[in-house]
Each structure stands twice: as structure tokens, then as C-alpha cells.
């Protein structure tokens, strides 16, 4: 039997993910966010060593960091808009995939320019991850717990940012 729905009846929608899925989603989103934020500062520690190993001046070597940060700033709003168009999950998963590939390239790089270009692309992938991160929280958490989700998100950024 088919029932019609009049304008006064509301169709119930799921409010956030059910509990086991919610935990996995929070861990996945949190881990990806942690890696993208952690990679902003991770090179700072080895900058003098990289400068020595690549035979570049410390001022030139800072472009390994600057390239990553500029890529994030340049593309953050674009990836956010792209998430609205094609879906947050697609942008997020593409960002994670590219982040893993560029991390491998960074680890295997044998020259200053290879590392710098890989870090720039890593910055674009980190931008894809972070641009849709907050938007995904409203699908993960029920409306009554969205503040908790934002708090956990902010805590992940604070801890991973040092």
C-alpha cells in the first residue's frame, strides 16, 4: 500500500551517523586533519639539515615550507566550493589519496626542487582535506552534538599544530 505525504507531515531524516559508524568517521576525519596540520610544522625541525644536505641557503630552503602553506591558502576556498558541487566525500578522499602519494614522493626525493614541488602538491592535497573537514562534521554528528564535533575538530588541530 502506498501512502501519500501531505504538507504537514515531515519525512524523518537520519540525524548524523549511527554510533559505530560515527566513531570510525570521526577517527578517519581527525587522522587526516591531524596529518595535514602536522605537515605544516614537521619540516621546521629538519630545515637546517635539509639546507646542509641539499647545499642550499637557509633562506632558499624555507620555500619547502612556504610552498606547502601557499598551496593551502591559494586553493582552500576553491576546494570548498568544489565540495559543494561534487560532494565533500569525493574531495576529501581525493585529498587523502594525493596526500599519500605526495608524502611518498617527499620521502623519496633526492633534490631540493623535487622535495619543494612535492610539498606544493602536498599542500594542495592538505587543502582538499581541510576545506571540507568542517562541512563533513554536520553529516557525522547529530545536530544536538555538532558543538562536540567542532570541539574535537579544534582539539585535533591544536594538538597536531603544536
Q: Across the structure, where does each feature detected by a protein language model lie?
A:
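Transmembrane-helix bundle of Major Facilitator Superfamily
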Residues: 2-162
Amino acid at each position: 500500500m502506498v501512502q501519500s505525504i501531505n504538507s504537514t507531515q515531515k519525512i524523518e531524516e537520519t540525524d548524523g551517523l549511527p554510533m559505530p559508524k560515527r566513531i570510525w568517521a570521526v577517527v578517519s576525519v581527525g587522522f587526516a586533519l591531524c596529518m595535514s596540520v602536522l605537515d605544516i610544522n614537521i619540516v621546521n625541525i629538519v630545515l637546517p639539515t635539509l639546507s646542509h644536505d641539499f647545499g642550499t641557503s637557509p633562506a632558499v630552503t624555507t620555500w619547502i615550507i612556504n610552498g606547502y602553506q601557499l598551496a593551502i591558502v591559494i586553493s582552500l576556498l576553491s576546494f570548498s566550493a568544489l565540495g559543494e558541487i561534487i560532494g565533500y566525500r569525493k574531495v576529501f578522499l581525493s585529498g587523502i589519496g594525493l596526500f599519500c602519494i605526495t608524502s611518498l614522493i617527499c620521502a623519496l626525493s633526492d633534490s631540493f626542487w623535487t622535495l619543494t614541488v612535492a610539498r606544493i602538491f602536498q599542500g594542495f592535497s592538505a587543502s582538499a582535506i581541510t576545506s571540507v573537514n568542517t562541512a563533513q562534521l554536520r553529516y557525522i554528528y547529530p545536530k544536538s552534538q555538532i558543538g562536540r564535533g567542532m570541539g574535537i575538530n579544534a582539539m585535533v588541530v591544536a594538538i597536531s599544530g603544536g
